[in-house]
């Protein structure tokens, strides 16, 4: 059975898997809702090295680069306006663990559960994984 997957750079993918954050931010919106698996990209986000909060938290986790590491439910995709950003700033940890800017989108995730890691090659956008690394681009974006 095919799984819907999104690749996220480390340490952010592991922050999700470890329950440290529940929102993923993107420059694009998705209409997809439902079960979503999180793939930790092979590359590490260089930006995180410039943020002390993120650097400190990154030391507390084992990065899982190149693996699908958790599953969740994508329940909403919210356009970031001034009001939304004002609200998110109150949750300092969540705010520091991604890029919150007017015009971006917040993907709201629930029921985040770590899984036994599955080696996989990452891709852009939401992609399908059938266990054999035969990737087909998702048309539901």
Model-predicted regions and their roles:
Residues 1-141:
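Structured alpha/beta reader/binder surfaces that contact nucleic acids or chromatin modification marks
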């Amino acid at each position: 059975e095919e799984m819907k997957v999104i690749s996220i750079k480390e340490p952010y993918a592991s922050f999700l898997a470890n329950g440290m954050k529940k929102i993923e931010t993107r420059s694009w919106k998705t209409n997809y809702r439902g079960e979503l698996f999180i793939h930790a990209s092979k590359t590490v986000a260089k930006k995180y090295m410039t943020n002390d909060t993120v650097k400190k938290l990154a030391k507390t986790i084992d990065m899982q680069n190149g693996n699908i590491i958790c599953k969740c439910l994508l329940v909403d995709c919210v356009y970031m306006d001034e009001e939304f950003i004002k609200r998110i700033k109150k949750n300092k940890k969540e705010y520091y663990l991604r890029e919150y800017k007017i015009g971006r989108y917040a993907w709201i995730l629930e029921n985040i559960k770590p899984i036994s890691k599955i080696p996989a090659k990452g891709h852009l956008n939401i992609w399908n994984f059938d266990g054999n690394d035969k990737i087909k681009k998702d048309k539901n974006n």
